[in-house]
């Protein structure tokens, strides 16, 4: 069984906005094994980008546990955090051009991101770009590449130092369906070859199926997990509700709305299952 590469428990992140304290993450749990590809979904403001910034070493968590590839992100000094960002994690920002330097060629962009000697980083850069379908476009600048190839180049930059973990924020947002599928297919082969773990933030159902494991974040906590099984043409989804260490769960929003659940619910132990019911008017009345 693969080791746990990302281990977050009770993760809390609080920041100030206009003199108010905002709790962006409220005891979030997340466990990702080495070699996995996981999609993170959720509404705007749910905490997705905050989580990515913590895993990328950009922000330090306020409380809780966050360990990535043996690095304790809650106890890092600035020098260690800088080394972590450059050696252990690659981060693809939402806008692909934000990852690239416009005046450099495709090859130079990836070469610049490496930390190895000249001969080694030249070979690695060429290999990465070739595997990403850019082997014949090494001398072109980002502006001359179409959306799909810019994403491929940005992925090459993020993977340049051989990170254990690749983070990507909406990597297919700029692409049409066909182009996104082609990019993801090539990326899957490369991640498998490099044995790289990946976490993607997305609203794209295609990317969720590609990841085979999609985790929903709601109100700063992981709420549901969907696992996709079967062949690509006929995949089947199995959705589970995530329970934290205290036994707390978040019911899917669609269920709550359909049953008009508010404030209190009745739980019944029925053999090997628990049922959740709306109480009658008298039982549900507030004092």
Task: Identify the residue ranges that each predicted region occupies.
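A short, proline-enriched helix->beta-strand linker immediately N-terminal to the Walker B motif
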Residues: 160-164
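Conserved ABC transporter NBD signature motif
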Residues: 64-72
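ABC-type ATPase nucleotide-binding domains, specifically the catalytic core motifs of the NBD
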Residues: 16-18, 108-123, 131
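ABC ATPase NBD coupling module
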Residues: 20, 73-90
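Catalytic Walker B motif of ABC-type/P-loop ATPase nucleotide-binding domains
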Residues: 166-169
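Helix-to-loop junction immediately C-terminal to a conserved catalytic motif
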Residues: 56
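Conserved ABC ATPase signature
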Residues: 141-145, 149
């Amino acid at each position: 069984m693969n080791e746990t590469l990302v281990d977050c428990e009770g993760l809390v992140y609080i920041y100030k906005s206009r003199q108010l304290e905002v709790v962006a993450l409220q005891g979030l749990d997340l466990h990702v094994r080495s070699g996995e590809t996981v999609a993170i979904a959720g509404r705007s403001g749910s905490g997705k980008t905050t989580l990515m910034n913590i895993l990328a070493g950009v922000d330090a968590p306020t409380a809780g546990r966050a360990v990535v590839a043996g690095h304790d992100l809650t106890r890092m000094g600035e020098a260690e955090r800088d080394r972590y960002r450059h050696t252990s994690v690659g981060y693809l920002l939402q806008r692909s051009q934000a990852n690239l330097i416009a005046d450099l060629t495709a090859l130079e962009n990836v070469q610049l991101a490496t930390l190895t000697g000249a001969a080694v980083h030249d070979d690695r850069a060429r290999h990465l770009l070739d595997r990403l379908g850019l082997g014949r476009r090494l001398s072109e600048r980002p502006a001359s590449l179409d959306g799909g190839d810019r994403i491929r180049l940005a992925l090459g930059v993020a993977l340049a130092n051989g990170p254990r973990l690749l983070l990507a924020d909406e990597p297919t947002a700029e692409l049409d369906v066909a182009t996104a599928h082609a990019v993801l297919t090539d990326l899957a082969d490369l991640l498998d070859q490099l044995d790289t773990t990946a976490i993607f933030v997305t609203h794209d159902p295609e990317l969720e199926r590609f990841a085979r494991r999609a985790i929903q974040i709601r109100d700063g906590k992981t709420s549901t997990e969907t696992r996709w099984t079967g062949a690509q043409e006929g995949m089947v989804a199995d959705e589970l509700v995530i329970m934290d260490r205290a036994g707390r769960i978040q019911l899917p929003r669609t269920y709550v709305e359909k049953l008009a659940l508010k404030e209190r619910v009745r739980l019944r132990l029925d053999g090997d299952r628990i049922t959740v019911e709306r109480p009658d008017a008298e039982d549900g009345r507030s004092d």
